[in-house]
C-alpha cells in the first residue's frame, strides 16, 4: 500500500485564527492525508524546522492577519536556503488576501493560494493531485537533519510494504545490536510515556526537554511522538501544537501515525529508535 501524503499545517506568527485551519485539517484527514499540525503563532523558523524534520511533501499556511506576502515568501526562501526546496508551500485565508497578492506569492514560489469560498473538496483534490505522486529521486541531503528525516521516511515507507515470501526485511535495531551504528551512544536515555488522551504526556515531555537542554548546553534530544491511525486513512499528528520548549535546533522531533498497528506504537518505531541512537535522550 502506498504511504499516505504527509503535509504540515500552521498559522503564522501574531495570528491566532485557527478555526479555519482546524476544519481543513479534519477534511484532509478524512481523505487519507497525514497532517502534522504545528498550531498558531508560529515563526518562519519554527515552520521550516518542523517541515524538514517531518519530511512533509508540503506546508499549508492559513493567514488572516495580513503580512502574508512576506511571510509565505520567507518560508519558501528559508526552505531553499536549508536545501529543502522539494518541500512546497500553499496557503489561503480570508478577505485580507487579494488576487493581486496571490499572483505576487506565486511569483515568489508559492504553489497555490485558496480564497474565501473555496470548497474543501477543491483543496483536498489539489493536495492529492499535486503532492500524491511518488517523489522524484532526491539529491544528497545538505544537512544532517534532512538526511535523518529522509532515512526515517524510508523506514516508515518500508514498513508499509508487504515483504516478499520467505524474506524478512532487515531491522535497524538488529544492526544496532551488531554494532553497525558507530555513532550510537551507550549512555543514551530512552524514556517512554503512555496514558489516555489529555493526561498531559506532551506537556510533561516538553518540560523535560527544557530541563535536559538547560542542564547540558551541548545535549541533543529526539522525540518520537505517536498518534493513532487506521490503515488507508489519515491522521492528525498534533503534539507539536502544544510544545513550546521543543522548538529548538537541538531537538529533533518526528510525528508518527500508528498506521493500523495496535498498542500505541508505529510499525517503524523500533527501527526509528535505532536511527536516533546518537542522541543524548530519546522520548
What role is predicted for each listed range?
Residues 15, 196-199:
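ATP-binding Walker
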Residues 11, 195, 255:
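The Walker A (P-loop) glycine that initiates the GxxxxGKT/S ATP-binding motif of P-loop NTPases
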Residues 1-5:
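Non-catalytic signal-transmission and effector/linker regions of two-component phosphorelay proteins
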Residues 204:
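Hydrophobic positions on the alpha1 helix immediately C-terminal to the Walker A/P-loop
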Amino acid at each position: 500500500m502506498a504511504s499516505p501524503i504527509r503535509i504540515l499545517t500552521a498559522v503564522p506568527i501574531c495570528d491566532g485564527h485557527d478555526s479555519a485551519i482546524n476544519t481543513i485539517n479534519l477534511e484532509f484527514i478524512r481523505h487519507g492525508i497525514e497532517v502534522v499540525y504545528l498550531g498558531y503563532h508560529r515563526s518562519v523558523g519554527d515552520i521550516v524546522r518542523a517541515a524538514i524534520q517531518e519530511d512533509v511533501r508540503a506546508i499549508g499556511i492559513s493567514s488572516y492577519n495580513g503580512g502574508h506576502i512576506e511571510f509565505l515568501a520567507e518560508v519558501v526562501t528559508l526552505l531553499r536556503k536549508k536545501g529543502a526546496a522539494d518541500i512546497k508551500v500553499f496557503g489561503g485565508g480570508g478577505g485580507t488576501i487579494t488576487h493581486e497578492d496571490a499572483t505576487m506569492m506565486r511569483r515568489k514560489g508559492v504553489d497555490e493560494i485558496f480564497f474565501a469560498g473555496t470548497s474543501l473538496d477543491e483543496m483536498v483534490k489539489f493536495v492529492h493531485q499535486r503532492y500524491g505522486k511518488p517523489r522524484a529521486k532526491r539529491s544528497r541531503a545538505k544537512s544532517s537533519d534532512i538526511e535523518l528525516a529522509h532515512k526515517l521516511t524510508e523506514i516508515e515507507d518500508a514498513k508499509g510494504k508487504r515483504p516478499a515470501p520467505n524474506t524478512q526485511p532487515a531491522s535497524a535495531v538488529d544492526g544496532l545490536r551488531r554494532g553497525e551504528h558507530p555513532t550510537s551512544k551507550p549512555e543514551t536515555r530512552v524514556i517512554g510515556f503512555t496514558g489516555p488522551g489529555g493526561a498531559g504526556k506532551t506537556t510533561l515531555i516538553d518540560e523535560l526537554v527544557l530541563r535536559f537542554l538547560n542542564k547540558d548546553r551541548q545535549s541533543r534530544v529526539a522525540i518520537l511522538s505517536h498518534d493513532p491511525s487506521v490503515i488507508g486513512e489519515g491522521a492528525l499528528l498534533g503534539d507539536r501544537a502544544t510544545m513550546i520548549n521543543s522548538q529548538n535546533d537541538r531537538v529533533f522531533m518526528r510525528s508518527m501515525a500508528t498506521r493500523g498497528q495496535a498498542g500505541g506504537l508505529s510499525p517503524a518505531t523500533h527501527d526509528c529508535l535505532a536511527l536516533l541512537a546518537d542522541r543524548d535522550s530519546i522520548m
